[in-house]
Amino acid sequence: MSQNTTHNVHASTPQNARNGDFLAWPFFDDAHRQLGTRLDAWCTQELHVDHHADTDATCVSLVRQLGRAGWLKYCVPASHGGALDKLDSRALCVLRETLARHDGLADFAFAMQGLGSGAITLAGSDDLKQRYLPRVAAGEAIAAFALSEPEAGSDVAAMACTATLDGDHYVLDGEKTWISNGGIADFYCVFVRTGEAPGARGISAFVVDADTPGLTIAERIDVSAPHPLARLKFDNCRVAASQRLGEAGQGFKVAMMTLDIFRASVAAAALGFARRALDEGLARAKSRQMFGQTLADFQLTQAALGDMATSVDAAALLTYRAAWQRDVLEQRTTREAAMAKMYATESAQQVIDRALQMFGGAGVVSGAIVERLYREIRSLRIYEGATEVQKLIIARELLKDG
């Protein structure tokens, strides 16, 4: 697919004047407000969603497009080609919410550049940062985050993929699965067991180039909302020790630090999906005629819209509180980000379901906007920590504080 290809949506993006109202909240400064406004205008002009069967090509094209436009600069610090001195959670959330409201795959392309390179930003040597981050910011290199395994998803400390020190190299053996951007990534941030200590303390992180001998794509995985996804296999895969992120045995800490930064942005993506669903539901309710009146005239519809709008605002407050606390108060936000991720993804599923119901049979037609949203939101309740895991994290933090 060429980078200038345009596509069609079943309907244009509804222009709901309230979509940007949240930017007036005290969580943001003028730079965030301008960022949201500029990206919304860019998305309206440049993103024309009609994803073709070749999801890989579409995703690669979106990464290049986001890079050329400068949006990927917010995924890395200014010292290595980025837009801001350090990663800004509020900017990441505003960007993801806006992209998700327009195009879920564009949000995915942006998000994986940040998540896939975040460990380098946080723990990489100067050499690693210089070699990888400017290319990520320009959209010239596609990043991936390789943490999950066939028998170690949420239980990260149970991972079995190993790296054995051999002179000035490590030899990686094992598998990773559910790897977003798997098959199209230029490099992977891989977390493996190096054995310095039992459990989480014996994990290290490495940057592994996609063309490294011994690394293969064992399986491409198809899911309900198509995006590049794969199972990776490492078989006697030699990686230079200089590719390690941080000290040996610090990989679990690096992974958790990375997820803490980007978890609130998952909530923001869910929020973008929910806002779009609310817009679509409102438009449908006001235009659909039945029994001599509009759908919006029915009290049941009004009650649903009231619940939907309240859920959207509640999710936004939790999401941007977490981002603000990290940016402004410089606080650790493990609990707050988990709350935001849990509530925003769960409530977005409900908002989208109610919007789809307003369309009746038209809502489940393949390719309809609400049908696409229904498929896209489901995975957000699972990846980067399933809802059940977020509840455990919240409880753990409460008990620790108590």
Show which residues each predicted segment covers.
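Alpha-helical interface subdomain recognition
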Residues: 2-101, 123-128, 135, 139, ...
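Flexible, small-/acidic-enriched active-site or ligand-binding loops
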Residues: 158, 211-238
